[in-house]
Amino acid sequence: MARNVLEELPGAALLTALLAGIAGVVGSYALAGYTEAFIAAPITSSLTERMPAALLRFAIGPVTQFGQLLGIEHLGQQLNLLLAIGLATGLFASLVLAALLTGRRLDTRFVRIGLAGGLVWLAAAVLTGSPVTALGAGAGSALVVGVAAFTRSVGEPRDTTSATSGGRRAVLGSLASALGVSLLGYVLGNRPSTVTPQAAASAETNGETNAGDASEASPGTDATDAESDGNDENTENDEDTGNGANDRTVEDFLAVAEERSLGVAGLEELVSGEDFYEVDVQNVNPNVTRQEWSLSITGTVESEADFGYADVTAMGRELRFGTLRCVSDTLNGASMDNDVWTGVPVARLLKDVNPQGKFVMLRSTDGYYEEFELETLMGSFLAYGKNGGPLPRKHGHPVRALVPGHWGEISVKWLDEIEVLEGPQKGFWEERGWHGTGPVNTVAKLHATNSLDDGRMQVAGHTYAGTRGIERVEVSTDGGETWQRAVLSGRLPPGTAAPPGAEAAENAWRQWAYTYEPPEGEHEVVVRAVDGTGTLQPREETDSPFPNGATGWVSKTVGGGGLFG
């Protein structure tokens, strides 16, 4: 009988093990999709948690910015994911190789196949905690090993002493089966959400659905999960503010935002929608349904409490504009956006537990956590809808926190616990040297530069100062020597539960634009903002957003046949 391929052609066995490892990763993706049950998910989490703070800053800073220049979003996270996939492939390949060695000693292909699949399944089940979806990993690896074993023996003479031709057939069989598994795994892993068309139609017929956001409603959730998130018109606990504000719908808010937009070419509208930025600690977003979600309030409270999704939505339904900006956003970056949110004030939940401490730690289902003052949380919002649709999975479905006027890192997504603390502690980013729990820095960004048909130049952007609001934006076209006031978009309206007399949204950005006769050649355009307290945006520019967020005046060189800077 011919000797095993491992003895006669070790290179073929190593290649078979590698291909089986790849097939195991793809098989995991086929059953789990891009969820926490995918084999790469726990590995990326472990890499992130153990990554040195300096390396993590480099990944979310220079690496991410370089990726944006190449048109690649979140390059740092993508590299982390690739590393995790590589490690998973190496782990599975090692286990398959061990199975092949064991099978060689026993001189039976069935041991090789069964052991390869079993070891890979066991490893995937232990790492992900999901033995069912781990079957995909085991099946993928076992299939490649099985095809390699059987193709090697096909047509092999019984009295041959050479395994070379059989080894080649084994390699070709491994390669073909790995390609087949990869194609099938890609198709299955990217299968449409299990949210049914009927549920999607139900959400869209509530009268306030933004098609863009509704379409991204939490893939992988159950059929009822997309129904009526933020759209229920029969809520009995809507509070009457006395000014008719509760009569407004999401469509009304969106219409006002469109009307008040300056309509500048190349400038994002006042409502971001699907373009809303996304920054997460983990590569794979949690996949939590409304039915399984709950929020616990624990710690230094008179009585701890748990709230389900139905409990939160029964407390009322408020609409409000809200802008978020990430503390890692560069001075003229794009990690700042605005939308219409549906939810309830956090204070309604806190009054039931009577908190005794002065600080809180907000925790997420993905292991993220951030600490800040209880007083700040009292003015915050629990959002369960966005632009008339359910809160998308990537933005915290089913419920997230929104902390007005503060850096986005404390607006925790996939919120599942509020722990009241007696004293301060460090959150995830503070443990890594950041200080992003306070109010946002005032900024005026310069994102649009247009040469108009009449020969004039138009520059425009967004401006934001948190709850301080924006009083004016000033533009200089001579490098800061002289200043002119820009045109501002109208203030967005207050929320449906705003106090009587409120004239504008508490926490929303504005657009600005300035049109002028350009001088000959290149010239430097500088922009700065004055907030609602009359305070001028600080001029000194930081080298990076770390640790307190970017500051400075945005400047660009314009003219001379193009835009520079």
Question: Where are the regions that the model predicts?
Answer:
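Structured, non-membrane catalytic/scaffold regions adjacent to prosthetic-group chemistry
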Residues: 195, 220, 229, 238-565
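Hydrophobic alpha-helical transmembrane segments in integral membrane proteins
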Residues: 182-204
